Amino acid sequence: MVTVNPSQAHCLPMKMSLPGFNTLPHTATTIPVSIRSNRTMSFFEDPTKKVRKPYTITKSRENWTEQEHDKFLEALHLFDRDWKKIKAFVGSKTVIQIRSHAQKYFLKVQKNGTKEHLPPPRPKRKANHPYPQKAPKFTLSSSNALFQHDYLYNTNSHPVISTTRKHGLVHCDVSIPSSVIKEEFGVSENCCSTSSSRDKQRTRIVTETNDQESCGKPHRVAPNFAEVYNFIGSVFDPKTTGHVKRLKEMDPINLETVLLLMKNLSVNLTSPEFDEQRKLISSYNAS
């Protein structure tokens, strides 16, 4: 007969560890709240979205001096809105800085209501090759359907056609040079063409760039006063020679300025107000 020993346990207790398992002491790990929130946010974010870099000012803004602003105003009178030429005239600012300064200046003038010179806005450029449109099927009638022409006058004062077509006929009573008509229309001066032939022989739209417009205008260029006064000072220096050669090598505007100043100087020296100066100069010559 088998007897059960009450001291022996039928099963292993819960706190007893098996050999080879759970040998390390149990430690509870806690995740910080910030890490858990970041993990939650990263789970819902789009993985393809790029991380935006923080905005940093790489270059500090440079204030305009009074001399630079005066040059800017003078260049605005000369070149209107040709920013590249204004940049070359000012010399110390970029095109972007000049355009930004001009925008602020225009807003300030409009707000104050002062009568300052503001250059007109640039005309919108038309396409060199506009998208072809189907010609409307109109019957030939002389009472309606005429072209409305606009003319762009260039420097040689010849009109050039450069506008849109509204109806089906071309009115040829306007005095246009025959060379322009033959080149653009391919017909004689007193002939009219329908819209279909007009589409086959489309006129080239004249678009003058800003450089061409500026070339047509007479620009005032300031003389180089350093060179002018240097030459006038060398005239009274007995050690300096070759004045005629230097005059020939000068720019026309510098040469004109030198001659004008020398003429004014000679007129002033002949006036009675400079008698003492003339006597002083003659005493040096006598000695």
From Swiss-Prot:
Residues 111-135 are annotated as: Disordered. Coiled coil: none annotated. It comes from the Eukaryota. GO terms for molecular function: DNA binding; DNA-binding transcription factor activity. Residues 56-110 form the HTH myb-type domain. Residues 83-106 bind DNA. The keyword Transcription applies. Pfam families: Myb_DNA-binding, RVE6. Its main location: nucleus. It is found in: Nucleus. PROSITE patterns: HTH_MYB (PS51294). Keywords: DNA-binding, Nucleus, Transcription, Transcription regulation. InterPro entries: Homeodomain-like_sf, Myb_dom, Myb_dom_plants, SANT/Myb, SANT_dom. GO terms for cellular component: nucleus. Probable transcription factor. This is Protein REVEILLE 3. It comes from Arabidopsis thaliana (Mouse-ear cress).
